[in-house]
Amino acid sequence: MDFPGAARLLSLLLVPLLLGPARGLRNASQRTFKIDYGHNRFLKDGQPFRYISGSIHYFRVPRFYWKDRLLKMKMAGLNAIQTYVPWNFHEPQPGQYQFSGEHDVEYFLKLAHELGLLVILRPGPYICAEWDMGGLPAWLLLKESIILRSSDPDYLAAVDKWLGVLLPKMKPLLYQNGGPIITVQVENEYGSYFTCDYDYLRFLQRRFRDHLGGDVLLFTTDGAHEKFLQCGALQGIYATVDFGPDANITAAFQIQRKSEPRGPLVNSEFYTGWLDHWGQPHSRVRTEVVASSLHDVLAHGANVNLYMFIGGTNFAYWNGANIPYQPQPTSYDYDAPLSEAGDLTDKYFALRDVIRKFEKVPEGFIPPSTPKFAYGKVALQKLKTVEDALNVLCPAGPIKSLYPLTFIQVKQYFGFVLYRTTLPQDCSNPTPLSSPLNGVRDRAYVAVDGVPQGVLERSYVITLNITGQAGATLDLLVENMGRVNYGRYINDFKGLISNLTLGSSVLTDWMIFPLDTEDAVRSHLGGWHGRNHGRQDNKAFAHHSSNYTLPAFYAGNFSIPSGIPDLPQDTFIQFSGWTKGQVWINGFNLGRYWPGRGPQVTLFVPRHILVTSAPNTIMVLELERAPCDDNGPELCTVEFVDRPLISATPTSSHPLPDLSDRDSGWDRV
């Protein structure tokens, strides 16, 4: 049965079986969802109800696969799903909204409804979720003094406008209006944030009521510690907690009872796995531990949401980071019951067996794991260095400034900015280039007159010895590795946020190039013909040649084999010999690769971005060192394989903090 055709057929057969009567969006009469405080339970249409839900983030799963993943969740015995709504995903620029295609949250929720799944909606405005800036749009930082997640007037004005766009779209999808949404979360784990601003929570409460109506069931979620609920809970909003499988369940729910003496027990985030960071081992939580703890939670009569049921992928630049600065990788597999690629795991079946002891689990076939195909190796050719492609990457030319400007100041919210100045002194002997205030956010790839010098890295490498003559061009290609998504430092400015020094001199007179890699890749695929043999390539290996090459673009293409049915299929791309960079396939930004740091080695390639009618184009931006160069016989290749590798032993030259405890145990996602 492990074929796409079979999966599609099963989906068509299952949908009518899974749909209950009277599930149309217009059948809203007599539909209610309330709390029965006298019996500590929910009531759905007047009947006792308990939800067992799972988290799925539509923004981390291709729309092409939404139905497949939702069906698998339904067949696991879940009666609801939970999802966040990331503000920055839908309003990337002020007043520019995206609600179509991959951003069509309304379609996603209606699809869940069609499949008989209820919805627990978490619209923020802050979501955390290991997502860039916790879902808050970076353009909020244009007001540098803004206090995020507070009653700061500038912040409230932006939030008010956003909620005025989003929530009216959600209102028709509320359960009482015939839709699937049974509860709506206000903010997210606010008790873990430093501001403790009740005026802010009251403002949100009013706006949610204004837009959604007085009968919608609002709730909050906080870690199962008294200190978190002190600032996270608010009268009139039902307080829930979150905790993982290592927690004392009785003690955790006693914390909820201090805020909610009566009402249903709810764990809004029961952790099935945990998040990863570059340079740390892949997180795993043993299946038997999760299954045993879930059994105990359900035996308490509690409602529970499994976070995550499927993690998915941080495509493009969407990953978040923690403090001390530690960005998350492209994969958000989370060791969840469904893998990053949506495959069934032993954990899936173990949790399904637990659920069937308490609730009825649908009978019938479970949609199978999707087949994978190893397309093999693809040769890539070097196109141009970033320096030589500046006319394409930054057609408007540079911004001039006496001192460095941040990404926000040049309105570059993601990706890369090139900072350029000249050496004010002779550096024939190695001279320290320093960021004394740890002002490189987050990595800077340094070159002098086209000769690679090394990398400055936030919190780890703040000084680098460079050489060059007075008047030589100093370039720093600065990469935004993902904004902090949790804690008091989410106002995470990127770029050079403070001055650099060369020896004892402050560097001035900068030319700043915001790089539009997305437009360049989409508009100029195949347009940068020929290999470059200018001064930059001739010198690229004259200094530190064993460690670095200049950041450069490489491209190649491959065709889907003919004569094999049901192609294209999902695959995984790996980068043997490559170091760190970004990859696009047919203009789709897959995300970051960093096998030199680990633990993720392969990137998930969903089949819907591949084509059979023409060659598929791969574009790679290698930032540190490619496995080939202009002066050697090595061939640059990437390889498509049929198995993921996201748990390699990490390698790092820096001591990395263990962030698995963030606050205490499992308090946070």
Curated annotation (Swiss-Prot):
Biased composition (Basic and acidic residues): 659-669
Glycosylation sites: 27, 248, 465, 499, 547, 557
GO BP term, pick one: galactose catabolic process
UniProt cross-references to Gene3D superfamilies, sorted A to Z: Galactose-binding domain-like (2.60.120.260), Glycosidases (3.20.20.80)
Database matches in PROSITE patterns: GLYCOSYL_HYDROL_F35
Chief location of this protein within or outside the cell: other
Protein name in the entry: Beta-galactosidase
Originating species: Felis catus (Cat)
